[in-house]
Amino acid sequence: PTYWQLGVNWASKDYDPYQVPEYKAWATEDYYKSGYAEMLDVYMTGLYYSFITKDDVDKATGVVGQRSEAGMDNSLTYCYSVEGGAEIAKHITRGVVPVIGSIYVEQYLGDFTPFGPAVTQALKSTDGVMIFDIVHLNKHKLWEELEAAMKAAE
């Protein structure tokens, strides 16, 4: 919900943010016309978040985790979790394009414990997963974790 600041509107033209009260501050009445989901074959959404589930956000005590992507802020909102980010992407693309959840391996540098659950959540919440990037799987020897996470999503 903050990428509009960067001029990005990968939503479907059927999604009108002007109808969402908290978005009226930035969305114009015609903003929905700039949505381009219908022109995509696939949309890969970056789910580069420390929180995996919306429940994790609810349990947070003010520590937001790594937030280095453009357009991010420090709020404790569901959009900053793998589950919540995927939910928003699916909602605003309106089913006109497959949504693939992208997981950045080094988001979990220092503690790879959440990597597997992030992959599992991305697979459960979207139409597939893209791991960014294979070099990190090799470097950190995470192939077994990836396999287990993919099986857990079945």
Model-derived features: positions:
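Glycoside hydrolase catalytic-domain groove-lining segments
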Residues: 1-110
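Aromatic-rich peripheral "rim/lid" segments of glycoside hydrolase catalytic domains that contact
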Residues: 110-128, 132-154
